[in-house]
């Protein structure tokens, strides 16, 4: 269940990221950790790699933006990172960027059982996610897809 402050914090994070040449990928608030942790994932708007220095440099402005809004009333740790291998693909841009990369698709079959299919990502459209599995195209109904995750080339 998402944290109740997520709808208030997300626009602050998105606008702060945009002001510094980044795009907000994801934000999570982990309250099971002490102190709670706010995880912010960013990527460059020009598509180039995000460096450790970029993350460190963005931490200050992001922390200041959160503090100025006074939304978090308890101590927290702010973590800035970028998506990497093993991350779930979510946006249309993710699916375009990682076309032909090895992925694992988690989906529900016609009987409602969870299934996993590994292969090279071909595309995601309004109806299907298409994966190349050893030279054969596997079409999985988009409505059945639970997640699509990057995997290492060896599986």
Curated annotation (Swiss-Prot):
Lineage: Bacteria, Bacillati, Cyanobacteriota, Cyanophyceae, Synechococcales
Family designation: Belongs to the RimP family.
UniProt xrefs under InterPro entries: Ribosome_maturation_RimP, RimP_N, RimP_N_sf
Transmembrane segments: none
Pfam families listed in its UniProt record: RimP_N
Record organism: Synechococcus sp. (strain WH7803)
Localization: Cytoplasm
SUPFAM superfamilies per the UniProt record, alphabetical: YhbC-like, N-terminal domain
Name used for this protein in its record: Ribosome maturation factor RimP
Gene name, Swiss-Prot/TrEMBL: rimP
Residues annotated as signal peptide: none
Principal localisation: cytoplasm
GO annotation, biological process: ribosomal small subunit assembly; translation
Sorted UniProt keywords: Cytoplasm, Ribosome biogenesis
The keyword Cytoplasm appears for this protein: yes
Function in brief: Required for maturation of 30S ribosomal subunits.
Any single GO CC term annotated in Swiss-Prot or TrEMBL for this entry: cytosol
